[in-house]
Every structure is written in C-alpha cells, then in structure tokens.
C-alpha cells in the first residue's frame, strides 16, 4: 500500500513523502491517526493543494515541542515522593503515568506517552535520568528524584 505522509513519522519519512507500507500498518495506524492518506490520484492532487498548510502545521508542532523542551531544561529536577519498604525498595513502582503527572503538576504539560523508560518502571529510591520525547525530533532528558515518604 502506498501512502502520502501528512506529518513526520519516525523511521518512515517526512511531510509529503510517498512511501510504501504494509497494508495493515497503513489502514489500521497511519490513516486513522491522520498521519497519512492513501496515495490515489485524487488524494495526491488534494495533498499538493494543501502542502504549504500541512508543512506550516508540522513546523508549528515542532516549535511548540521545542518550547516545552526549553521549559523542561530550565527546571533542574522533578521529585516524586513514594512509600518505601526496607532497603529503599518502593511499594509498587514509578511508571510513565506517575512521571507525567509529576511534571504536569509542576506546570509543564506532558502525556504519559511522551515519557520514555527503556529499562521499565522504577522500583527503588534514587536519582534517575529520564527522556521525554515531545516530538519525533525533540527529546529532552530530565533529572528525576524518587524520595522516600
């Protein structure tokens, strides 16, 4: 299935690229999320008419993400207070939702999907470096402190 990308998609292409993807990926993910349209003659003509508008919207999203990344960089640390047991082990764990809620409580809106924890949830008291991916091209590392209650 050939599609035209309406926004930048990681490891696939940028706005306006005509790419070949598996039918299921195009039908079930790219098209419903508004990231692409099927590459038919009429859609290609419609896209060319809207190209400048779509590129401007993509640029605006990136600029907004860079602004949020700057706010995250200005804030030195984010702290989460959690209940702990013996030897600094947490009761439960700290996951992406907890981190996103802590950052949002400090005034910077972040969704849980933007928080990247490649090693999985955090289960001990301490300092951690966590990546926040605000846009395909914009990632900001933050310092997260998990303290005992």
From Swiss-Prot:
**Which GO cellular component terms, listed alphabetically, does the Swiss-Prot or TrEMBL entry include?**
ribonucleoprotein complex; ribosome
Keyword Ribosomal protein part of the UniProt annotation: yes
> Its domain of life?
Bacteria
Cite the GO molecular-function annotations of the record. rRNA binding; structural constituent of ribosome
Q: Please give the biological process terms from Gene Ontology that the record holds.
A: translation
Keywords annotated in UniProt: Ribonucleoprotein, Ribosomal protein, RNA-binding, rRNA-binding
Q: Name one Pfam family in it.
A: Ribosomal_L9_C
Q: Which SUPFAM superfamilies match?
A: L9 N-domain-like, Ribosomal protein L9 C-domain
Q: Which HAMAP family match?
A: Ribosomal_bL9
Q: Which family does it belong to?
A: Belongs to the bacterial ribosomal protein bL9 family.
Give the protein's function: Binds to the 23S rRNA.
Report the protein name in the record.
Answer: Large ribosomal subunit protein bL9
